[in-house]
């Protein structure tokens, strides 16, 4: 059975370790820094079997070359981005098993945050990188609102029980923004309180469940009247299509 373990890195990154404790093997997702990965492997007596990358940003790839120097393992990453060390380029609809773990993953193209961003989907789990966050989504550094809205639609179509393993601990800021958009959403108010309590205890707020995102994440709720009304009020524009609502929400969040 595969266990997913969070490795905090930098100020707010999460590196994810997919672990088979019986085989004493692990695969790492988005290792922005090699040192905490090596420390986690040593502490649990694990050997690295693969490196998995969602997008090219350095805080998700900065540890790849150092890890490869110590562990000559395959590196899976986006085919349409330049990531040092990638030996197994991926794009939708590729599917593969993680070496040593037997964990099946399928690939979704989710451009928006970066042009070639991919997400990795297992049974009941999503490694979303910086595409979908708990309560939010990634900034549009390279893609368009239309691309990101379509990408989030793919992710939102996954089963509600899917656990979302995202790349950053941005949840409090995301939910506080979401509460500006939907102050009368009781699910959002409850989730914000739970997240605040978790952070006060020093606990992570991720993974979330896709059901939580459907109920509280404004970027997955751009089709709803209350969200559209809030976006129109902020933008001072009539927004006839959900993608226009999404684009206004993203600008609003960027400026908040």
UniProtKB/Swiss-Prot annotation:
Thiolesterase that catalyzes the hydrolysis of S-D-lactoyl-glutathione to form glutathione and D-lactic acid. Monomer. SUPFAM superfamilies: Metallo-hydrolase/oxidoreductase. SMART domains: Lactamase_B. It comes from Alkalilimnicola ehrlichii (strain ATCC BAA-1101 / DSM 17681 / MLHE-1). NCBIfam families: GSH_gloB. This is Hydroxyacylglutathione hydrolase. Pathway: Secondary metabolite metabolism; methylglyoxal degradation; (R)-lactate from methylglyoxal: step 2/2. Binds 2 Zn(2+) ions per subunit. Belongs to the metallo-beta-lactamase superfamily. Glyoxalase II family.
């Amino acid at each position: 059975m595969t266990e997913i373990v969070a490795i905090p890195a930098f100020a707010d990154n999460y590196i994810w370790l997919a672990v088979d404790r019986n085989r004493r093997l692990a695969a790492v997702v988005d290792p922005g820094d090699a040192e905490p990965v090596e420390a986690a492997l040593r502490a649990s007596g694990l050997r690295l079997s693969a490196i998995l990358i969602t997008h090219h940003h350095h805080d998700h790839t900065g540890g790849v070359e150092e890890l490869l120097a110590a562990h000559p393992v395959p590196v899976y990453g986006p085919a349409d981005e330049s990531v040092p060390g990638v030996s197994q380029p991926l794009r939708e609809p590729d599917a593969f098993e993680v070496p040593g773990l037997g964990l099946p993953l399928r690939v979704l193209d989710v451009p928006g945050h970066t042009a070639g961003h991919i997400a990795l989907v297992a049974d009941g789990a999503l490694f979303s990188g910086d595409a979908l966050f708990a309560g939010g989504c990634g900034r549009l550094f390279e893609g368009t609102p239309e691309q990101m809205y379509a990408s989030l639609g793919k992710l939102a179509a996954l089963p509600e029980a899917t656990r979302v393993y995202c790349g950053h601990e941005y949840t409090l800021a995301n939910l506080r923004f979401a509460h500006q958009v939907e102050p009368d959403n009781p699910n959002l108010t409850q989730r914000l309180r739970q997240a605040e309590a978790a952070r006060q205890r020093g606990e992570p707020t991720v993974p979330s469940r896709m059901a939580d995102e459907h109920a509280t994440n404004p970027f997955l709720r751009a089709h709803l009247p209350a969200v559209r009304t809030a976006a129109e009020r902020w933008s001072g524009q009539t927004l006839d299509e959900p993608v226009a609502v999404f684009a206004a929400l993203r600008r609003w969040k960027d400026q908040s």
